[in-house]
């Protein structure tokens, strides 16, 4: 997509003033549509409405892979929303370079974002050529294995404490009519599971060499071969999932139809909505119980450039609201994510969130792949792992060869 060629059309379209019955209405687009996510979004909307403005919800059903092209098309096509969700990283890079997004540096400076946002890499991901273009709202980590205590009780085995024990328990789960590992059909779920396995099995340094340094030799080497072996185990264990959306896979764990799920901490919102309690109804293993490391992925809001002064002021108000301490707590407790502020009260956090906070405090973190790789490279990864998990005839060796080629060509 050549965004720069479309920029002139958008700038012309926003040159004329917009007319609205209520100039403080602000459309906010996002892809948070599951039950737990919707409850979290409601907290953001409530906080923003309290400023005297009005949150106009622009939820787009489906994953980020479905929503982002729609969001980008609107911005480049001259129909920008007031604010839009993207993940931490490079997803809005071309939009910023094309001059289509607002510079939030003044707001960030007045609100002291550099002093309150932790880790600092989150704000770094919002910064291009020294200017800040987004407001981070949470830290979401992929590195979690969620386990159904009821499923393992039914299968007559102890709840696993790590990935190897989980793999060993798979036959007992299958014998009890339980799918060992729930993975939905959306491509991002398969590639996310692989990335989690890499951190757990190959370690933090190897993860950085492959995705940060884009070292194709390491990607083709023996350490990553072990990861592909584990991915092959995961593929076999997930046979029979037969669901598409991530929250449907989470529901299989909640209802005891599946033993576990590799999924980010946003899954906590679904467990909470179902009235389940961490440690009693389900178990969470950060780093798959092998390497207690979490990624600092998550979400941020970007603000398209508008010429309507009232809406621009509403954008300022929203940016400030997103980082307000009370908003941070209310939103993240329901979202299952960690706040980006290091100075908020999280005494109400559940056991799993407390584990994440402790890991974050220790500094056992890595950047998310969205922060390290371009959207195009991420899409190539998704295509590969979607095929790998769906096609049992693709060998781990063949998949690793293709993976190394993707890393070699990564930008």
What residue spans do the PLM features occupy?
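Conserved N-terminal structural module of periplasmic/extracytoplasmic solute-binding proteins
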Residues: 21-98, 110-113, 159, 276, ...
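Extracytoplasmic/periplasmic substrate-recognition and gating elements
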Residues: 24, 46, 51, 155, ...
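Hinge/lid segment of periplasmic solute-binding proteins
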Residues: 89-142, 167, 193-195
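Short, solvent-exposed loop/beta-turn-alpha elements that line the ligand-binding surface or hinge
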Residues: 105-118, 201-226, 273-277, 286-293
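Mature extracytoplasmic/periplasmic domains
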Residues: 106-109, 266-270, 299-376
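Extracytoplasmic/periplasmic solute-binding protein
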Residues: 128-137, 143, 167-213
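Conserved C-terminal helix/tail region of periplasmic/extracytoplasmic solute-binding proteins
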Residues: 153, 359-411
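Glycine-centered hinge/linker elements that transmit conformational signals in sensory
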Residues: 170, 212-242
């Amino acid at each position: 997509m050549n965004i720069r060629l479309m920029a002139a059309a958008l700038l012309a379209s926003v040159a004329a003033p917009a007319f609205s019955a209520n100039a403080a209405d602000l459309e906010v687009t996002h892809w948070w549509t599951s039950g737990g996510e919707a409850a979290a979004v409601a907290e953001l909307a409530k906080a923003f409405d309290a400023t005297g403005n009005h949150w106009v919800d622009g939820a787009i059903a489906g994953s980020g892979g479905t929503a982002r092209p729609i969001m980008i098309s609107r911005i480049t096509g001259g129909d920008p929303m007031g604010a839009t969700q993207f993940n931490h990283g490079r997803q809005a890079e071309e939009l910023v370079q094309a001059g289509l997004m607002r510079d939030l540096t003044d707001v960030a400076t007045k609100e002291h974002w550099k002093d309150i946002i932790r880790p600092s890499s989150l704000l770094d991901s919002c910064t291009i050529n020294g200017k800040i273009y987004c407001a981070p709202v949470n830290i979401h980590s992929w590195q979690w294995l969620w386990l159904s205590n009821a499923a393992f009780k039914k299968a007559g085995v102890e709840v696993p404490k790590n990935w190897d024990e989980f793999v060993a328990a798979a036959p007992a789960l299958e014998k009890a009519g339980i799918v060992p590992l729930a993975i939905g059909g959306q491509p991002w779920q398969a590639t996310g599971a692989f990335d989690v396995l890499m951190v757990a099995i190959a370690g933090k340094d190897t993860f950085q060499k492959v995705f940060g340094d884009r070292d194709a030799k390491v990607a083709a080497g023996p350490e990553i071969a072990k990861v592909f072996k584990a991915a092959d185990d995961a593929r076999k264990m997930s046979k029979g999932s037969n669901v598409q959306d991530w929250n449907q896979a989470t529901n299989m764990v909640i209802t005891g139809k599946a033993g576990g799920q590799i999924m980010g901490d946003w899954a906590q919102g679904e467990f909470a909505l179902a009235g389940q309690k961490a440690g009693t109804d389900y178990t969470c293993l950060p780093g798959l119980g092998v390497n207690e490391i979490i990624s600092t992925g998550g979400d941020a809001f970007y603000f398209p450039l508008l010429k309507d002064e009232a809406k621009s002021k509403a954008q300022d108000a929203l940016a400030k609201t997103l980082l307000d301490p009370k908003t941070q707590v209310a939103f993240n407790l329901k979202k299952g994510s960690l706040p980006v502020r290091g100075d908020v009260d999280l005494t109400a956090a559940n056991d799993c969130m407390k584990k994440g906070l402790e890991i974050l405090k220790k500094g056992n973190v890595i950047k998310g792949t969205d922060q390290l790789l371009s959207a195009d490279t991420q899409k190539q990864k998704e295509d590969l792992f979607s095929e790998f998990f769906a096609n049992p005839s693709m060998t781990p060796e063949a998949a690793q060869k293709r993976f190394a080629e993707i890393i070699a060509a990564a930008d």
